[in-house]
C-alpha cells in the first residue's frame, strides 16, 4: 500500500509584537514599508493608542488593572497588566516559530510587559528575539535606570537581544534632523532585521539556510547584532559586508568573539567565487575560534549589479567564566604528598633512600610537602579555607 502525503511546503511563521507606544510605532513603520512574510501584533495598556495601529492583531493588556488608560510610566503596572493577560498573550503567539519583540525601554508598558511576553514565548518553545531602544540621556537618570532594569529582565527570557541607544540618533543624524526621520531610522533597524531573517528563511537558495540554522545561531546567545548591506561595482562584496556589520545605530558591542554567525548573500547569476570568498574572509575576522558559522547564497535572476548581504552575529561580548576552584585541604595535602616524591624521583633518584621502608619515606616526604603547601606565606589561597578546616588539616 502506498500512503499519499500532502506535498505542502512548510515555512516558518514569524510574528512581530510591538509593546507599548514605541513598539506600536515600530510596527506601524514596518507595515507601511511592506515588510512581507510576517504577522504583526500590537500590545498596549492604552486603549486609545491601539486605535491608530496598522497591525492585524491588537491586544489591550490588563484592562482590569489599567482600565485602558495606560501604565502611567510605571513598569510594575505594565508587568501586572501582562500577567493578567498571559493566556491571551499565548493565544496571539500560538503557531509562531519565531517572535520579534520590539519596544522602547524606560516607560511603563514596554519595560514591564515585554519581559512577561518574552517569558510566555519561551515557555511555548518559540525562538524569541528582542529589539529595544534605550532613552535619550536628557530624559533623566530615573528613566535610564528603569530602562536598564527592564533590559536586564528582558535578557533573561529572550534568545537574542538587540539594543539601540536613542543617543546614537543625535550623533549620526545631527540636531537638524526631524524627529520623525530620526525615529524612523531606529525603526529601520528592526525592519531590516525582520526582513533579513524572513528572506533567509523563506527564499530558497543555491546554498540554502533554513529556519533550523537560524535557531542554532540565535538560541540562548544573549547580545546580538543584525545588519544588512547593499553595494554595487567591483568591490561590492566587501562594501556590502562591511555595511552590514557596521551599523552605527546599534549599541556599542564588540563583534570580536561572536559565537554564532549567520550570513546570507543575495546576488545575480554573476556572483563570483572571489566575491563569495571576500564575504567569508571579512566574517572570519571577528568570529570566535569555536563559532557556529553558516553562510547561505540566493541567486536572484532579477538582480543586476547589486549584491545584498545580511549578517546575524550572536553571543557578542561573551566572557568565559572562570571555573570555581573548590579547595579540599585534606585531598590537596594527600595529592601533594603523592606528587612531590614522584616529581623529585623523576628529577634525581636516590638509590640509598630505597633501602628505607616505603611508609617511612612517604612520611618524611609527606610532612615536608604538607608543611610547604600549608604555609600561608606561600599560598594566599590558604587563607580562603575556613578556619575549622585549616585546624582539622593541621
From Swiss-Prot:
GTP binds at residues 21-25, 108-110, 139, 143, 187. One of its GO terms (cellular component) is cytoplasm. The keyword Cell membrane does not apply. Keywords: Cell cycle, Cell division, Cytoplasm, GTP-binding, Nucleotide-binding, Septation. SUPFAM superfamilies: Tubulin C-terminal domain-like, Tubulin nucleotide-binding domain-like. InterPro entries: Cell_div_FtsZ, Cell_div_FtsZ_CS, FtsZ/CetZ, FtsZ_C, Tub_FtsZ_C, Tubulin/FtsZ-like_C, Tubulin/FtsZ_2-layer-sand-dom, Tubulin/FtsZ_GTPase_sf. GO terms for molecular function: GTP binding; GTPase activity. GO terms for biological process: cell division; division septum assembly; FtsZ-dependent cytokinesis; protein polymerization. Its main location: cytoplasm. SMART domains: Tubulin, Tubulin_C. CDD domains: FtsZ_type1 (cd02201). It is found in: Cytoplasm. Pfam families: FtsZ_C, Tubulin. Homodimer. Polymerizes to form a dynamic ring structure in a strictly GTP-dependent manner. Interacts directly with several other division proteins. Interacts with the SulA inhibitor. Essential cell division protein that forms a contractile ring structure (Z ring) at the future cell division site. The regulation of the ring assembly controls the timing and the location of cell division. One of the functions of the FtsZ ring is to recruit other cell division proteins to the septum to produce a new cell wall between the dividing cells. Binds GTP and shows GTPase activity. NCBIfam families: ftsZ. Belongs to the FtsZ family. Formation of the FtsZ ring is inhibited by SulA. This is Cell division protein FtsZ. It comes from Pseudomonas aeruginosa (strain ATCC 15692 / DSM 22644 / CIP 104116 / JCM 14847 / LMG 12228 / 1C / PRS 101 / PAO1). The gene is ftsZ.
